[in-house]
Regions:
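Left-handed beta-helix
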Residues: 5-6, 11-12, 17-18, 23-24, ...
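Glycine-rich adenosyl-nucleotide cofactor-binding module
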Residues: 1-2
Length: 62
């Protein structure tokens, strides 16, 4: 099950893999697909339609 902090903004159409974490103030936009065990750091931005594989880390404010 993905873990999303309350202050993060994840679009309803985004897909988050098992074990993925989205931290405070991060954004994951429409149609984005994140694999398993990914980390989206504080304040990071994942744009519309972006695809990330498994075990990826997007650093804070990236």
């Amino acid at each position: 099950m993905p873990r999303v902090q309350p202050s993060a903004d994840v679009a309803d159409s985004a897909q988050l893999g098992e074990g993925t974490s989205v931290w405070h103030l991060a954004q994951v936009r429409e149609g984005a697909v994140l694999g398993e065990n990914c980390i989206v750091g504080r304040g990071a931005y994942v744009g519309t339609g972006v695809r990330m594989g498994d075990n990826c880390k997007l650093q804070n404010y990236a």
